[in-house]
């Protein structure tokens, strides 16, 4: 693996207007190229806020972010061309078909013509959605919507993919399909930044994880190294529970 950082975060802090404390508190870390980087923590830990800053959805209060060597606040148009974003909230139009939604997102990323049609057909087939391509999204199950949501973020073959809880609320079969194809994307060269509170999934999916709570990163390493460094820990969830002083199912 090429270990040179594709993302560099230095002293990142975010406080929203009228808030009494920071949502993100002095975060510093790097993401290596072709890594699957997991930002893990309970609800309200600061995962989505951090990811939103990295995506350029709003600026930090202080600190800096470099993506592919570019400052996110100065080179946002370039950065938006090389990243894909899969938000936790389903970003699809329920009144359009799956194919129409993907056509819309493809044009937004500058794809058109035969190239766009090919990529839509390719990914619909890969994620077992070809037969549903002309159905309205409003008729889809949660798992199907998650898969279309994923395709919308990867049609343009991004160098970096941001995923916010991509498998939350879906059935096991859909979750396995999504994770399998994300691993294939990573093998093809896409760096993945992924937020989740699902520790078992993250342990099997990520090459590196950082655990965040109350806006601060508590630790970071490969899942195997984190488990080994905490005596008696059987898995990543044990590490998480110790560091955040939580009990099982208290996430």
Map each language-model feature to its residues.
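Catalytic Walker B motif of ABC-type/P-loop ATPase nucleotide-binding domains
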Residues: 161-165
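ABC ATPase "signature
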Residues: 220-221
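Conserved ABC ATPase signature
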Residues: 95, 136-140
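Conserved ABC ATPase "signature" region
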Residues: 103, 107, 114-132
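Conserved ABC transporter NBD signature motif
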Residues: 63-74, 78-79
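A short, flexible loop at the N-terminus of ABC-type nucleotide-binding domains that lies
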Residues: 2-6, 13-26, 33, 76
């Amino acid at each position: 693996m090429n270990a040179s950082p594709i993302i560099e975060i230095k002293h990142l802090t975010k406080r929203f207007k009228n808030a009494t404390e920071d949502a993100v508190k002095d975060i510093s870390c790097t993401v290596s190229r072709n890594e699957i980087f997991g930002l893990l923590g309970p609800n309200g830990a600061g995962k989505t806020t951090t990811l939103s800053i990295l995506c350029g959805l709003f600026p930090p209060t202080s600190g800096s972010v470099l993506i592919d060597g570019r400052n996110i606040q100065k080179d946002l148009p370039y950065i938006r061309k090389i990243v894909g974003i899969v938000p936790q909230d389903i970003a699809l139009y329920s009144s359009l078909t799956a194919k129409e939604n993907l056509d819309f997102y493809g044009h937004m990323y500058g794809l058109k013509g035969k190239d766009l049609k090919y990529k839509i057909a390719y990914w619909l087939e890969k994620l077992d959605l070809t037969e549903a391509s002309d159905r309205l999204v409003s008729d889809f199950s949660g798992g199907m919507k998650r898969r279309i949501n994923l395709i919308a973020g990867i049609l343009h073959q991004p160098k970096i993919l941001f995923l916010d809880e991509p498998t939350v609320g879906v059935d096991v079969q859909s979750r396995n399909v999504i994770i399998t194809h994300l691993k294939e994307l990573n093998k093809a060269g896409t760096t993945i930044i992924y937020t989740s509170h699902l520790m078992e999934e993250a342990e099997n999916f990520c090459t590196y994880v950082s655990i965040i709570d109350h806006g601060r990163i508590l630790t970071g390493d490969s899942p195997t190294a984190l488990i080994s460094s905490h005596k008696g820990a059987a898995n990543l969830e044990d590490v998480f529970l110790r560091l955040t002083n939580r009990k099982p199912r208290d996430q």
